[in-house]
Amino acid sequence: MQWFIQDVNIGKNLRSLRERHGYSQYKLVIKLHLMGSSMSRSTYSKIETGTRNIRISDFLALKQIYGVDFSEFFVGLLPEKNTFV
């Protein structure tokens, strides 16, 4: 169950990044296609809702499209630096 929650949260972060950059799902998928991805809009939608996992190649393409650090995808999912004793 914990993994599902993280998938949903990653999906929320992906949606936030997409909206922040002003893309519809359709326009984002077109950009992904230009980078060699075969992802459909419905597949991307499932990734945003946490019902499907993202392929590493698509993840890397999104990083390049958005021009962000990997940590942007994991906001709220990674433990704080000083939480371990």
Which residues make up each language-model segment?
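Short, charged recognition helix plus adjacent turn
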Residues: 2-4, 19-20, 64, 71-85
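Conserved hydrophobic/aromatic packing and binding residues within compact polymer-binding modules
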Residues: 14, 28-29, 44-47, 73
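Residue-level detection of the helix-turn-helix DNA-binding "recognition helix"
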Residues: 19, 33-34, 49, 78
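Short coil turns linking two alpha-helices in DNA-binding domains
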Residues: 24, 35, 40-43, 55, ...
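Short basic helix-loop element that most often maps to the first helix and adjoining turn
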Residues: 12-33
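Short, basic-rich loop-to-helix N-cap that marks the start of a DNA-contacting helix
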Residues: 49-61
